[in-house]
Structure formats: structure tokens, C-alpha cells
Amino acid sequence: MEENYLRSIDDPKGIIECYETYGAVGITGVLSVQECMETVEEVKEIIKQLGASEQFNIYDPNTFDNWPDMNKHMNKPGVIGTLPIITKILNRNRFHPNVKKAYSLIYGLPEDQLLAQFDRIGWMRPVLDKDGNKFPQYATPLKEPGKHLDVNPSYYFDESKADEVYSWLNKLTFDSLRHLISENNASNVKFGRHCIGVLNLLDNKYENGGFRFTPGGHKITPSWYIRNQKRLDYGSANGNYFFDEKDEEFLHSSRIPCPAGTLIIFDAALPHGTLPNQTSDIRMVQFLRYMPKKLYIEKTLSRRKKLILDYCNKNGIKLDFI
């Protein structure tokens, strides 16, 4: 039977085994269909607040001109905004019992030792309308091998830089929401496992595009880094890396097509990317991850918590479970 990398939220053993074997797992049943639909409606409202008119329809590329500032508020791959997007519904998903359960399982840590992180949403646009007319301007760009790491290899794989990364994290002042994005990619193997996640809000078929990865690649990247260390020694503690044609061992790719409500969690050392959409359907996701609380000292945790609570209180968003 062909591996599909999907495991139920009620299969903890299967979740852990899949993650450890392949570096990624699609955990099904994390959100209900109703919760997904509520989130899709929330995304529609967010887009409206960013300037889309009543004539705009997220499913119909013929209407996309009714969001004049689209290219200002989202990038080519479909990520909306440059700051974390914080709303009641998105927070419900961030702190959902099944989300906390999933991350607790994979990290091997109690839920109260993990911190929910605040990120953005993704709306990957269709390249066809329902009549088959083409809209290539909305295609997700792809340059093979089309994979990257959401960490800087130099700072992540080199254990001698662990103290530098720890210091960098704890120097974050959290006087801006931007720091909630800055913290995302800062880690080091010495800290233990580092996980990243994508919550799928709609059914995602292979041809719809989406998450792809090199199965088991997280086991190869440490030795790849050692061989390529000299050319990789640059950048900042929270950087990233885009693979190129020299990185032949990561050319092979697999996808994880999945039903709505599936949370794909993958390892920071796993080469991954996005396969472009080829259809008239959309893909919609919430970027959703957790990190170990131990990476921050108490003063940093207090600054971070204050920033989040102040923002939520100012915007009338109830948040009593941080």
C-alpha cells in the first residue's frame, strides 16, 4: 500500500512513527468541517478589510480585480500580510485542543511547556476559472528543486552557535508584532526537535498544489550541511535557505493531499516547498506552529505575553488561554 503520510489525531503512535520516519505527517481530524468553514469565512472577512469589494469572490479569478491592493497585501505564493494575523477564529485554531495535542505528541513535551506561535494565512489562487479560462498571473512561482528550509542551516545545524541563537531570541523586545514573525526561524539542533505546521482549511487534491517535501530528508540534511558548511556560513540566526541545482539529494518530492482540517507538521530540517496549483480550485491554509517555552527566559516570556494580550485587548479579541 502506497504511503500517504496521513494519520488520525486519534492515532498517537502512528503520528510519531510517521513524523520520525519521513520528517512530516498529515494529522487528520484536527479541525471539524464546521470549524474549517468558519475559518474560511474569517479569511474572506480579513480580505474584505484589506480593501476587497463586495464583488470580490475568492473562488473566481474573474473577480480578483475587485481587490485593487491584492499585490500589496499578499505575495506571489499566496501568503497574506507581513505581520501575524490575530483574530478570534484564528486564535481558536491556534489554541485548539487537537492542535495542542498534536504538537505535544511530536515534541514529546507537556502542553504547558509549549508556546503557540502567531503567523499568517495563505490563499493559493486558482489558475483557471470554471470555464477553463487561464489566469497564469496567479500561478505559484516554482524554480526547481523548489524546496527550502525555514531555518538558517549555519545557525541551526552548528551546535556551537546554540548560545548565540538563544541570546538572539531573548534579545527580542516584543514591542512590535513583527517579533512574533522574527522568532519563527530561530533555532538550533542543540535545543531539540523544532516543528513547523500548516493547517489545511479546504480539501486539498494533488493537482490543487500545496505542501511537498523530500521524505526522510531531515535525516540527510545534517550531513549535507557538514559537506557544504563553507558556502552556507552566512546570514542571521532566524534566516532560511533555498536549495538549488547543486543539492541533488533533495530533488525527489512527495505531496500530502489531504482533507480539510488536516494539520501537516514537519521537521525544521526537512527540505520542503509548495507545488503550484493547476486547477480552478483554491487552497487555503493557516500557518500554525508551536515552540518549546524553555527557549525564553521569564522576562522575555513576560514581554511576549504582554504584546499579545495588549493587541487582543485593544482589538476586542478575548484571549484568556495564552
Predicted regions and their residues:
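Short, solvent-exposed loop/turn segments at secondary-structure junctions
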Residues: G23, L31-Q34, G122-W123, L128, ...
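Residues that flank catalytic or metal-binding motifs in active/ligand-binding sites
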Residues: I86, Q117-D119, K143, R193, ...
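Residues immediately flanking
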Residues: L109, L149, L201, D267-A268
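A structural signal for short, well-ordered beta-strand segments
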Residues: I121, G197-L199, Q286-Y290
